[in-house]
């Protein structure tokens, strides 16, 4: 795998849309995965022997213009979720500075632990709405998939979910890489 910290961040300006417009997603299994409300981490772990989080980078930064729910400095973390050594999902987390001041250790010291375990096991964290996005084959994330030796023949699809802790919001974006989509098509899961 030729991903280095010099490549960080991969995130780009994204046009998110509501799940009501998900009819354009032809792959029914992918659509189900995109709209699933439970923990993606748990779902992925059930499909493999070795689940791994590979951190691409993390840092304090300004949010992108498309991250409208967050208007302050954010802690950004970008990772690959790998199943049996193969990257399946690119994930990007944005945690606002005010939430870091409130719960810094929970987020900044995850290391290679999946964030999903914290998000779906902590009663104070409330999952919010899901939004979807389509990434053309020339996007930065498609180039990431190519650098991971995954062939890009169709656009990539991803989802973004907002989570609330008190009055603060964090955002998690998950983009399904070609290896995940190929598995879904093959195994109908």
Curated annotation (Swiss-Prot):
Recorded GO CC terms: cytosol
SUPFAM superfamilies (UniProt xref): Chorismate lyase-like
Transmembrane segments: none
Pfam families tied to this protein: Chor_lyase (PF04345)
Pathway terms, separated by semicolons: Cofactor biosynthesis; ubiquinone biosynthesis
Amino-acid positions noted as binding substrate in the UniProt annotation, renumbered to this chain: 77, 115, 174
Bridged cysteine pairs (disulfide): none
Catalytic activity, reaction form: chorismate = 4-hydroxybenzoate + pyruvate
Superkingdom of the source species: Bacteria
EC number: 4.1.3.40
One GO biological process term: ubiquinone biosynthetic process
This protein's UniProt keywords: Cytoplasm, Lyase, Pyruvate, Ubiquinone biosynthesis
Broad EC category: lyase
Subcellular location as annotated: Cytoplasm
A GO term, aspect molecular function: chorismate lyase activity
Family according to the record: Belongs to the UbiC family.
Protein purpose: Removes the pyruvyl group from chorismate, with concomitant aromatization of the ring, to provide 4-hydroxybenzoate (4HB) for the ubiquinone pathway.
Protein name: Probable chorismate pyruvate-lyase
Gene: ubiC
């Amino acid at each position: 795998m030729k991903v280095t910290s010099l490549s960080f961040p991969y995130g780009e300006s994204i046009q998110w849309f509501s799940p009501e417009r998900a009819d354009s997603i032809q792959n029914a299994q992918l659509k189900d995965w995109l709209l699933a409300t439970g923990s993606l981490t748990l779902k992925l772990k059930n499909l493999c022997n070795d689940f791994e989080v590979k951190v691409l980078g993390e840092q304090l930064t300004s949010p992108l213009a498309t991250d409208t729910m967050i208007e302050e400095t954010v802690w950004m973390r970008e990772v690959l979720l790998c199943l049996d050594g193969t990257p399946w999902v690119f994930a990007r987390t944005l945690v606002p500075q005010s939430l870091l001041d409130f719960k810094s250790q929970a987020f900044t010291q995850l290391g290679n632990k999946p964030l999903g375990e914290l998000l779906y096991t902590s009663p104070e964290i409330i999952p919010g709405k899901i939004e979807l996005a389509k990434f053309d084959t020339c996007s930065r994330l498609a180039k990431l998939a190519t650098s991971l030796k995954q062939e890009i023949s169709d656009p990539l699809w991803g989802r973004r979910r907002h989570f609330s802790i008190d009055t603060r919001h964090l955002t998690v974006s998950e983009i399904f890489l070609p290896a995940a989509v190929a598995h879904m098509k093959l195994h109908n899961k």
